[in-house]
Amino acid sequence: MILTVKPLQGKECNVQVTEDEKVSTVKELVSERLNIPANQQRLLYKGKALADEHRLSDYSIGPEAKLNLVVRPAGERSGVAGMASSSSAVSGVWQTLSTVLAKHFSPADAAKVQEQLVKDYERSLRQLSLDDIERLAGRLLHPDSEGMDTSYMD
């Protein structure tokens, strides 16, 4: 199938791929055509950022689809360093959850329940669109703004 990749500024290109290709492969093809290093690319489909390790079929990307390309500046990190502190907070949540589950389930059942919760959590995060993330960030950064429903955060 042929995908069209359109940078926010610049000329678009077409790439020939299969639906089983990984996003990282698409980035390599785009890198060859547009001279943009793969590590500086962020591909979006219908407002959702695509993860390198996932396949196009994971996002239901079909023939004639159009992907948007955001180019990161050369010196900018991919966000891994900035996520380290939030990552430790998340691991703290999973550790606390593990402790709570251990009080109510056998060790094997607690591990299964936690594994399923982690999978559900990660799936939910992958399904967030950029609009969803923007709304959530706005609500968290400006909780006192009028007209915003923040009751779900209680």
UniProtKB/Swiss-Prot annotation:
It is found in: Cytoplasm, Cytosol. GO terms for cellular component: BAT3 complex; cytosol. This is Ubiquitin-like protein 4A-A. Its main location: cytoplasm. Keywords: Cytoplasm, Transport. GO terms for biological process: post-translational protein targeting to endoplasmic reticulum membrane; tail-anchored membrane protein insertion into ER membrane. Transmembrane segments: none annotated. Component of the BAT3 complex. Disulfide bonds: none annotated. Residues 1-76 form the Ubiquitin-like domain. Component of the BAT3 complex, a multiprotein complex involved in the post-translational delivery of tail-anchored (TA) membrane proteins to the endoplasmic reticulum membrane. TA membrane proteins, also named type II transmembrane proteins, contain a single C-terminal transmembrane region. One of its GO terms (molecular function) is protein-folding chaperone binding.
